[in-house]
């Protein structure tokens, strides 16, 4: 696998996330204003269509995540892959959009043997159309990312949160992710949204070189 010469070294540990990803997922029903949790008779979790775009911005990675309402033409099957879900779920109105900037910390640890991965710490900042801005701490280990935030700024109409947690992973060439949240006044976190996406477009460096990021046949990545 050829690594583009102008790919920033601090982006390489998360380069497997770059490009355009499209897929589907499930989203928990949001509480109404003034209500901590949905009513018992509220609808169950609903299907959504998701798009994630990862790009290189200087020494950072930018992830833009868009979530759209979905209407399924058949009963939801949790085993659907990204393509099957997209074929069965009609894309509706935009629910939310988030922009996230990831900054990987420098490391002088020697590269591990093939098939092994060094953990890399990072920080991130995000802002969403739902009125949440957050500062995140995270770690990347191979094609897996885990990140948390307890520093969340809330807009006037935003759902009141005290904690966010997010996980990403590469499984059989698909990007899988989940986000949990802890509502204000609650002790336990609930899964807010999940997703399963396939890559539809590779990212490129400033020179125009394609960033592979992933060897689908071996579940490998750049660094």
Task: Label the model's feature ranges.
Residues 2-223:
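Soluble ligand-binding/transfer domains with enclosed cavities or grooves
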């Amino acid at each position: 696998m050829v690594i583009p010469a102008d790919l920033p070294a601090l982006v390489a540990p998360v380069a497997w996330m770059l490009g355009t990803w499209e897929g589907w997922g499930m989203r928990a029903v949001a509480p109404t204003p003034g209500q901590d949790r949905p009513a018992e008779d509220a609808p169950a979790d609903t299907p959504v269509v998701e798009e994630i775009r990862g790009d290189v911005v200087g020494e950072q990675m930018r992830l833009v995540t868009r979530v759209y309402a979905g209407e399924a033409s058949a009963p939801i099957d949790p085993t659907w892959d990204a393509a099957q879900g997209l074929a069965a779920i009609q894309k509706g109105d935009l629910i939310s959009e988030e922009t996230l900037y990831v900054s990987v910390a420098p490391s002088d640890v020697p590269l591990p043997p093939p098939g092994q991965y060094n953990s890399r710490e990072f920080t991130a900042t995000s802002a969403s159309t739902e009125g949440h801005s957050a500062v995140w701490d995270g770690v990347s280990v191979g094609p897996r990312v885990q990140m948390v935030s307890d520093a969340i700024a809330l807009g006037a109409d935003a759902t009141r949160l005290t904690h966010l947690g997010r996980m990403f992973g590469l499984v059989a060439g698909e990007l899988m992710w989940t986000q949990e949240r802890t509502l204000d006044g609650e002790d336990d976190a609930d899964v807010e949204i999940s997703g399963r996406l396939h890559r539809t477009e590779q990212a490129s460096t400033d020179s125009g070189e394609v960033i592979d990021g992933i060897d689908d046949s071996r579940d490998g990545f750049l660094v």
